[in-house]
């Protein structure tokens, strides 16, 4: 199971792991962590902001919804192409679903371009991301060709069904989303732990100072014979 799950990684995981591991090392030697900006946008660069956006939990949810929507569009296209619904719908309906599907694929193409710009070579370290990108590009090319040649789907219909395999992206998106949320919670807990450790250290220091003050006052009272020494 662990051998399979290691392929369900998303771009940005490596960077976050390195930064959080470095923070763990620094906590042992420096003051506890304060509330700091997200690691990806700490540099205030466009690439950093884009990394944060593409790795965020909300963006993963949007991708999951679009994948489900795209799968539904493809399913309707297949049913229409097989003429299972031909008598029940107008002839323009297939074109509408086809262009809707292309619109969703265009968003996925932009997502891939954004990831390539933001993460560069790190993108190719994640096999599932590369496989997903290949399916998107192939599907987009087929859809563009299909606009001008309606008969091409009869010859390569099985290729467009590859897009239904993108449902696996839902599984990947859920795993990445849950993992990201868990890592963010763990990161916040580490920050809270650091803050609490700092407060404990301050309280211990105050207690030590109070004990010293009590000892000094006790000694002063003894010197003035307020009460005998024990």
Curated annotation (Swiss-Prot):
InterPro entries: Hvcn1, Ion_trans_dom, Volt_channel_dom_sf. GO terms for biological process: cellular response to pH; cellular response to zinc ion; proton transmembrane transport. It is found in: Membrane; Cell membrane. Residues 1-58, 120-127, 177-230 are cytoplasmic. GO terms for cellular component: monoatomic ion channel complex; plasma membrane. Its main location: membrane. Residues 80-96, 149-155 are extracellular. It comes from the Eukaryota. The chain crosses the membrane at residues 59-79, 97-119, 128-148, 156-176. It is a multi-pass membrane protein. GO terms for molecular function: voltage-gated proton channel activity. Pfam families: Ion_trans (PF00520). Residues 178-225 form a coiled coil. Keywords: Cell membrane, Coiled coil, Ion channel, Ion transport, Membrane, Transmembrane, Transmembrane helix, Transport, Voltage-gated channel. Belongs to the hydrogen channel family. The segment S4 is probably the voltage-sensor and is characterized by a series of positively charged amino acids at every third position. Unlike other voltage-gated ion channels it lacks the pore domain. The C-terminal coiled coil region mediates homodimerization. It is essential for normal subcellular localization. Mediates the voltage-dependent proton permeability of excitable membranes. Forms a proton-selective channel through which protons may pass in accordance with their electrochemical gradient. Homodimer. This is Voltage-gated hydrogen channel 1. It comes from Xenopus laevis (African clawed frog). The gene is hvcn1.
